[in-house]
Amino acid sequence: MSDLTHLDESGRARMVDVGAKDDTLREAVARGEVRMRPETLQRLAAGDMPKGDVLATARIAGIMAAKRAPDLIPLCHPLLLTHVAVDARLDVATSTVQIEATVRTVGKTGVEMEALTAVSVAALTIYDMCKAIDREMQIGAIRLVRKSGGRSGDFVND
């Protein structure tokens, strides 16, 4: 269990002490998608959704979620985020909304959970705003695609 930093010697969950770590620039990029019927995607593209501007609302929800990650994930450190961007674009070929979140900070720990939370909540928002016309939607492929900064170095999973 020594590789699992969120567990103490007895195997109990604990918050990692990052106090002695140096502040460095940290960035994480996460992606995910919402798959829907082609007719739903067409209505989304046309702005013809009963609940309003779905993509704008999803972007704002994702940004808000990144800032609230420590409230949702028990051992996640509260961080001063210096940048959060959430993009949602329509992919007609796959009948999906592709979501990407980029999060940055200068701090002692990474922002992977914030980026993943942003994508997840943006996807849930899209689902919520479209479910009245498409209950078959699927949220998926949520993953960390890139991170930089910190002792563990860079990670790329594109």
From Swiss-Prot:
UniProt enzyme class: lyase
GO biological process terms on file: Mo-molybdopterin cofactor biosynthetic process
Record keywords, A-Z: Lyase, Molybdenum cofactor biosynthesis
Entry keyword annotation includes Lyase: yes
Biological function: Catalyzes the conversion of (8S)-3',8-cyclo-7,8-dihydroguanosine 5'-triphosphate to cyclic pyranopterin monophosphate (cPMP).
HAMAP family (alphabetical): MoaC_B (MF_01224_B)
Identification of the protein by name: Cyclic pyranopterin monophosphate synthase
Organism expressing this protein natively: Roseiflexus sp. (strain RS-1)
Lineage, top ranks: Bacteria, Bacillati, Chloroflexota, Chloroflexia, Chloroflexales
Encoding gene (name): moaC
